Amino acid sequence: MTIFLLLSSLHPGNYLYGQEQPDTLSFYLPNILVTAIEPKIPGTVSLLPASTLEHTQPITIADLAQLLPGGLTNNSGVTDAHYFSVREVSLKNGVNQFHKNAAMGAQIWVDGSPLHFNAGINEPYEGYDARFLSLNQVKEAEIIRGIPSARYGNLTNSVLLLKTHQGRMPLSTSIRYNPKLKQYMLGKGFCISPQDHTLNLLADYTSQGDFHTGGIRLANLYHWLPAGKKLELSLTYTSRIGKEKQFVNEQNHTQRQRLDQRFSIQGEWQPDRRWLKKLSLRIDGSLQKSKQTKSQVNNASSQLYTDRKESGEWEAHVLSSNYMYTLVNESRPFYVETEMLVSTFFPLRQGREISLAAGFSYRSEGNEGRGRDFDRQRPPSTSIRPRSFREIPFLHTFCGFIESTYQTPNFQIEAGLRHQGLKSRDYAFIYQTEPRLNLLWSFFSSPSGYKLSLKAGVGWISFMPTLDKLYQESVYNDKVSFYYNDRNESGNSLGILTTHAPGRVRNIELKSTVNRKIEAGLIGETPTFRLDMTAFLEKQTNGFSSSEQYIPFSYREYDYLSTTQLHPEYRDGQVWVNGEAVPFQEKYSYTPVPVSVNTLHREKHGVEIVADFGTFAPLRTSLIVDGIWLCVREKNTALNGIWPIQYTDKTEYPYVGFYDKQGGPGNENRSEMISTNFRFITRIPRIGLVTTLTWQMIWLYRYRTLYNGSTGENVWPLYWCGTDGIIHPFTEAQKEDPAFAPLLSTTAPERFLSNSYKPYGMLNIRVSKAFGEHIMLAFFANNFADLRPTRYSASTRSYLQQNTQPFFGLELQIKL
């Protein structure tokens, strides 16, 4: 029906581009924007004004990605972690999911302050989990998909700039409800002086199932005009808590908690001098506490445990056969950052202008958490030790940039250079220099409204190693050397463990991961149509991964004593029974030790398109079509050891193979996707109604796993080592040696087949209804037609159901 009505309105002269026809009865509903805007500035940027956020009803910032070209709908809800990233093939088994790894390289700024999560270790909630950043306070968002300004750094994916309400906030409240999720918000602004200094207060709460989060935000804004020069000072404090319970039964339950506290002090002075137009200073701080408490029953029978952290042979605790343990993980990452910016501009003749900006920042971050702790008499497992994060050194980051913009009526160019470095104990200075360039050239313009513009950009962006990459956890391998337990005599037992503690293996050559971007685009405009098309290429090198080294060690295995009423004892490094030493054999084994490496390489290329067909007047319906063609190739060249667990005459297999493949079937993943969104936007100002019907289509989706560009059903190692620890190249002769036969890695051939699915789509609807100037009621429904086709996956030989389940919600906003 909608398509029929739309086609019936396609009559010459019945549509307007970018505007509504006059409506004398419209007195409270402006021509609001409900989609992302592609602004006319250098770079590839999407703007999301307040009206778009109110109409779209995103639950977290991760939902904003669906407004980008070719963006896909997420299954709304907060029971699972949310992550923000752009230009990623986030489909998995035909369902759109969040791309966790790419989210680490997305930089988020709130009112000019970046959020950093580089000091989190073993957290139950990752710092960049979008559920802990409220969108209720956000009034405008800007997403930089291409090459960002030189001011923004420590990223490899994108920049998300969030702006909160400026000035005095009206009394506002909103209630969002659906069968699973509930959200509440209340905010109010106050004038606290005759000079219109303001104080804004906001509180919100979100709940779904066992997950709960809520927070408050206080924002002060002061401004003066000393000697006629503008001076502003803003003070912001944000506190947020989160809590979740997973109760299986009385013997298995987990509780997670998180507390975020952030403050920001920003000052800006505009002396309006020739060489100094603006001077600003920012001081930020953040303290986060994440805690997970897990209680579970250990049903293992009579295990041995020691908490020694040195290599050697130790008398161990004999654990009970059945006991309840409690494992606590506490992480307290924090950072303090300061930044100073200066800028000026010089007007030239004929509407030309040159602007200059420079800045310097310093950040110190660490983790003061208790780490992992538990009762030593009731450990969660063997070969586990307590670990305090307070022992880990701090990270210190230094950044500086300079940037210049030259602008004429038809041409803009922005060029900048950024340099950032990271210093920590035990590591040399890690640094990276990043040149960046963006330009926009309007090379054709006619009086009748026809325009053609060219945009292009090239630049480097990089992401520094995080605390957990630089200081990985120490590894402990415990082997049972002797165990005696007299079932007829309680307490007559003795256990001896040999601990191999190779410690941490640090990669002192660890570098920052670098993404080199290049893009070019064309913008065409007519009085009734606008097209924005961007082609891009991204090559990310030195991505972070982990490589397992296998370190051999020897241990003693004492003879088994089956006779009862013996009383063995351990003294002078030997087990004794009745004054005689118990015989033993020398055995060999390996300890896998993970090492951070720069072996992940990603290449992305594709085309983004946004076409605005203007407004069809009779129906007051506009059509915007956006889409993306995206290809992603990811390869990990890490050398990983694999030790076949085989025994011959009760002796462990003596060789370890080293392969250029990961734990899966191969070392390379390729994926390709073509998706579009047809957004039909209808505005009826007389009754204050705006509706958006989105037809989302995935025309092409395919992915494949490869081994070095081909299949890898049978893969021999590149290197091998024995119990002497010496690594040797693997030769053709050894392939014929039966002793090395267990090192052949085999994979089913179908695991390397290409998975490709027929086109499929879904229908989403958004409805906003204004009641006067102060009340707004909004409704949304995702996949309301329940389009969930079944497709066959060749690589797994299984059938998969595409698309998310139907999901809907309702929101009421009141502003006074």
Specify the residue positions occupied by each region the protein language model found.
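Short, acidic, small-residue-rich periplasmic hinge/interaction motif at the N-terminus
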Residues: Q19-E54
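Extracytoplasmic beta-strand/coil segments of soluble accessory domains associated
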Residues: Q66-L115
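Structural signature of Gram-negative outer-membrane beta-barrels, strongest in the C-terminal barrel
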Residues: E391-R530, T534-K539
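Face-selective signature of the C-terminal outer-membrane beta-barrel domain
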Residues: H223-I241, T254-Y427
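N-terminal periplasmic accessory domains that precede
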Residues: T35, I61-L64, Y83-S85, W109, ...
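C-terminal beta-signal and adjacent terminal beta-strands/loops
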Residues: N542, Q696-T747, Y757-Y760, R766-L816
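Gram-negative outer-membrane beta-barrel transporters
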Residues: Q407-N410, K539, E557-N708
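Short acidic/polar hinge/loop motifs at secondary-structure boundaries
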Residues: S113-I144
